[in-house]
Amino acid sequence: VADLGGLSPALTVVVVVYRPRLEEFSACLKSLLAARADGLDLHLSLWHNDLGVQQTPGLADLYEQLQAAGLPLQSQGGRGNLGFGGGINTLMPSLRTPYTLVLNQDAIPEPRSLVLLAQAAAADADDVAAWEMRQVPYEHPKDYDPVTGQTEWCSGAAVLLRTAALQAVGGFEPRIFMYCEDVDLSWRLRCAGWRLRYLPRCAVVHHTYSEPGEVKPLALLGSVYANLCLRTRYAGRRQVLQGLGMALREMLAPQSFAGRRWGIAKGIARFLRNYAYFRATRQAAPGFEPRFAGWDYEVRREGAFHAFRPQAEKQAPAPLVSILVRTHHRPGFLRQALVSIAQQTHRPLEVVVVEDGSSDGEAVCGEFAARLDVRYFRLDPAQGRSRAGNRALAEARGEWLGFLDDDDLLYADHVEVLLQAAGAANVPGAYGLAWCARTRVVAEAQGQVEESFRSVEPDEPFNRLRLWHHNLMPIQAVLFHRSLYEQQGGFAEDMDQLEDWNLWTRFTVNAEFLQVRKLTSLYRVPADFAEAARRQAVLDAAYDEAVRRQERIKFTADPLRVRHLACDFARQNALIHLDRQQLFSMVGEWPWLARLNLWRSVVWRRGR
């Protein structure tokens, strides 16, 4: 039995059932039984939006088996389809446990995820009302704070709610039958003063899409109606008019599925019938700002359809990964960096912290002794960034290595994403996309900043010629195999700027790297124009020396590699580039060009 450290709150799992696939639903419910075996006190409450157990052959037997195995289970419903939120609202008055886990019938919690979820909720602050679980294989792409885990809204597919908070705001909105009712609930909780968290280390297997980029007609049509309702409740008339304009443009666009225009028109008509209701139930609160991004409600991280593997499909044993942190007299930033590492979904993991000169970081590292395998080293006197990095490399034990300077952050899936991608492509290095966050430092020692703007940069696929010209890979965005360090060595210790660029050029002389189009990290640059200009001037001054050092790099190449480099060079330096292969492909796509090319060949042969 797992030791929950005395933090084992009773919770009720509520599932709205509608014509389930028995095998999938059985796996979902059996995972709850496994959580009870791990020591978690949970109860299951089911609401049938279909006809009940007689609707699905074998379901009654499954319920009996689970009850006999010790799972407290109560099944109700059979009154017709009340919608997802409507079904949960019907169960809400009977909820007596401190926490309620809302779970889709096809969402299967990963082993021990519910135990971790319960521990996190019990240990959290009293003003947190919701803890969202990560969905596998496709994580929802909405952004979240990689330090606090706070998010703007929680998906209803798998979310633990504080029961008192759920009941206080009245549960789900009854006039939103399906889609975006979870956004509305999240925003009402926030307006009532509650905070929401995302817990990526607690996961469910939830196959929401049959293929990447799938268009789901019901979701699209339901979202149009719900979006207009939310604009009415949480924003002004200008946002409502903007939403109606978007809906009309959607009607004029080419149909991606049959009945699309008619479905949107019905959604608009339904919204107009409910406009007065949502206007009368407007919500607002100090500090709450609704976000409408088209039909979405969040800033999104690139990489929505990066496919994660469930635990059962992962490599075993997983390799040890070392995250190497350089720091200097910034304990607040270091603490944030270590929190973002502790949130990593990959295990096993170690952290090597090297402090250059100062000693503030030792106490910070001590705070994480129970959460991380963290080792602290100090250089005294200060010896510079490159020597600090080399000390970290020398101390690392991991098979794979990555850097995280103290003012940068990792999203929780960073190591998992890059390790999986590098393994699938059989390359010794991979790098993800990163936010470039323009910030003003309010209190450096405490790590307090004000962020003004974010962008994804750089965003370039791996290309040696481009890498020889400029750095494609922010230092925290890269994960590499330790064999590269063993072959090429570490940082040039006489470099204090662009030392990472020099390292990447040496690592990739004979090794391929892979760009992974998923955003997994964040680095900060000055928002102040004068400060940014001073920083850029320092980098510019170091650039020529960094380029000169490339003259010392030697590599061998076969004819095929030379040809690829030549093609890359031509493509990189051309304003308009069309190579022979592209021309042949274009000719093949246009029948009249193909016929013209055939006649040209015939005439040419006869002319000879």
Annotated model-derived regions:
Residues 204, 214-242, 261-280, 519, ...:
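Catalytic core of nucleotide-sugar-dependent glycosyltransferases
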Residues 222, 239-314, 536-542, 563-608:
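Non-catalytic, C-terminal membrane-associated alpha-helical segments of glycosyltransferases
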Residues 178-184, 219, 496-503:
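Acidic donor-binding loop at a coil-to-helix junction in glycosyltransferase catalytic cores
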Residues 46-59, 355-364, 381, 405:
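A conserved acidic beta->alpha catalytic loop
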Residues 77-95, 379-396:
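Glycine-rich, basic loop-to-helix element that forms the pyrophosphate-binding segment
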Residues 100, 401:
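Short aromatic/hydrophobic "clamp" motif used to bind/position activated sugar donors
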Residues 107-144, 413-449:
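Conserved donor NDP-sugar-binding/catalytic core segment of glycosyltransferases
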Residues 30-41, 339-348:
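Short, acidic, metal-binding catalytic loop of nucleotide-sugar glycosyltransferases
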